[in-house]
Amino acid sequence: MDKGDSELQGIGIGVGAVVFRGDEVLIIRRGKAPFAGQWSIPGGGLHEGERLEDAALREVREETAVEIRLIGLIGVFEALPTARDGEGYLRHTLMIDYAAEWLAGEPAAGDDAAAAAFVPYEEALRRVSSDLTRTAIADALKLRNTVTSGP
């Protein structure tokens, strides 16, 4: 095992949500390493014993002060380590992302978010830093349109 392999510290499980309010998407600017300053969707680590859906609701509330209703599962996204996390480790991460609708509250940055805002869909796609996040946003819109238009 080479030095790079020995620095890999397990697999992290994160849960996030693409939140819609009309034609807008809720995004946050990360406040902590390794992604400080980058725009993304609200999300974070799954706590031991926590249901995935509950984690998505909690993360959105903690990072943005917004209450949501989950529409459905978008998918599971895999991020191989390219940067050290806040603890200095290289971490392989699985993100489980949901589509959601806004219920109440105005975005206010909290927890590890430095900023939170609803922005138009196209602006959200431009602002977010990760191609995986852009894919999650696009997939969430497709799911939302399927759920709201029905068969």
Give the positions of each predicted feature.
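Active-site-adjacent beta-strand/loop module that shapes the phosphate/pyrophosphate-binding cleft
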Residues: 78-106
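NUDIX/MutT-family hydrolases
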Residues: 97-99, 108-140
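Conserved hydrophobic "DFG−1" position in protein kinase catalytic cores
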Residues: 19-20, 27, 100-102, 118
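A short coil-to-beta-strand element that immediately follows conserved catalytic motifs
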Residues: 67-76
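Conserved Nudix-box catalytic region and its N-terminal flanking loop in Nudix hydrolases
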Residues: 24-62, 66
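Acidic, metal-coordinating catalytic segment for phosphate/diphosphate chemistry
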Residues: 1-16, 87-89
